[in-house]
Amino acid sequence: MMITKQSYQRFALMRVFVFSLSAFIFNTTEFVPVALLSDIAKSFEMESATVGLMITAYAWVVSLGSLPLMLLSAKIERKRLLLFLFALFIFSHILSALAWNFWVLLLSRMGIAFAHSIFWSITASLVIRVAPRNKKQQALGLLALGSSLAMILGLPLGRIIGQILDWRSTFGVIGGVATLIMLLMWKLLPHLPSRNAGTLASVPILMKRPLLVGIYLLVIMVISGHFTTYSYIEPFIIQISQFSPDITTLMLFVFGLAGVVGSFLFGRLYAKNSRKFIAFAMVLVICPQLLLFVFKNLEWVIFLQIFLWGIGITSLTIALQMRVLQLAPDATDVASAIFSGSYNVGIGSGALFGSIVIHQLGLEYIGFVGGALGLLALFWLRFITIKFKKT
C-alpha cells in the first residue's frame, strides 16, 4: 500500500513538473524578442522601436483574448485542449523561424499569443488538480518556478542561440523544446474533463463579488507600475547607472534568480497570513523602484534592490493568482482568464506609461512613476482589505 502511495505521489509530481516546463517555455517565448530585437530589426531593415510593437501587440492580444477564447473552449476536455494549444504554439514558432517579412513574423506571434491566452487561463486550476494531496500550494509554486526560470535561463539562452546562429534559430529551438513537452503531456497527463470552468453566465456572477473585482483592479494597478519601470530597466542600468552590459546582464539574471526565492517563500508563508503576505510582497516591488534613481551609482545596492524586487513580483503574482482561485472556486477558468487578461493589461499599460515618462520627463524618472503607481495599488489593497475584511 505504501509503494502504491509513493508511486502516486511520484507520478503526480511528474505531471506538475510538465506544467512547470510548459510555463517555462511560454514565458520564454513571450519575452525572448526583447533579447533579439536589434537582430530582428536589422534583418528586416527596420527600426527597433517599430519591431518592438510586436511585444506590445502580444500583450494586448492576450489581454483581449483570454476571456472569450477560454469561454469558447470551456467544454473541451483539458488534455485534448492542451495538446491542441501546443500544436498551435509549435506551428507558430515554425512560421516565426521561416518568416520572410515582419508581418509574417507578427502573424506568427499572434498565433502564439492566442495559445498563451488559453494556456494561462486553465493552467493554474489544472496544476492544482493533478498535484499530490496536501501539495496544492507547492504545485502552484512550482508552476511559478517554471516562469521564473524562463527569466533566468530562457532569455539568456535564447540570446546566446541568436548570437551564435541567428534569431530564427532561437524560435526554432523553442518550437523543438515545445514538441518534447507536448509528447510528455500526451504520455503523462490523465483524461481531464472540464471542471468548474464557468460559462459566459459566470462573468456577471463573478463581477458581483466585490473583493474579486478589487483584486483584478489591484493586479492592473500594481503590474502597470512594475512594467513602467521593468520594461526599461536595461537602458536605465546602462545609461543612467552607467554600468557595463555584462553587469546589466548579471543584474537581470539576479532578478530571475530572485523569482525562485519568491516561489519558495510563497509555498512556505502564504497560507499563514495571505493578506500580510500580499502586502509585504507589494512593498518589495514598490521600494526598489522608488529608490532606483537615488542609489543609481551604487552597484551593490542596485543588485540588492533588483534581488528584492524579483522576490516581490514573483511572490505577489502567485499570491494574487491563488487569491483569485480561492474567491472563485465555482468558475476557476473564467476567473483565471480575467486574471490573465488583467495582468496583460498591466504589462501593456506599464510599457506605454514608461515610454511616455521617458519622452516627457526622462529615463531617470521611470522608477519614481512606477513606484508611485505601486503606492496607489498599496492604498487600494488597504481599502479593499478593510472594506471586505470578512471575505
From Swiss-Prot:
Gene3D superfamilies: MFS general substrate transporter like domains. It is a multi-pass membrane protein. It holds the Pfam family MFS_1. This is Probable sugar efflux transporter. It comes from Helicobacter pylori (strain J99 / ATCC 700824). Belongs to the major facilitator superfamily. SotB (TC 2.A.1.2) family. The chain crosses the membrane at residues 16-36, 51-71, 82-102, 110-130, 138-158, 170-190, 210-230, 247-267, 277-297, 300-320, 338-358, 361-381. Its main location: membrane. One of its GO terms (molecular function) is carbohydrate transmembrane transporter activity. InterPro entries: MFS (IPR011701), MFS_dom (IPR020846), MFS_Efflux_Transporters (IPR050189), MFS_trans_sf (IPR036259), Sugar_effux_transptr_put (IPR023495). It is found in: Cell inner membrane. Keywords: Cell inner membrane, Cell membrane, Membrane, Sugar transport, Transmembrane, Transmembrane helix, Transport. Involved in the efflux of sugars. The physiological role may be the reduction of the intracellular concentration of toxic sugars or sugar metabolites. The keyword Cell division does not apply. Coiled coil: none annotated. One of its GO terms (cellular component) is plasma membrane.
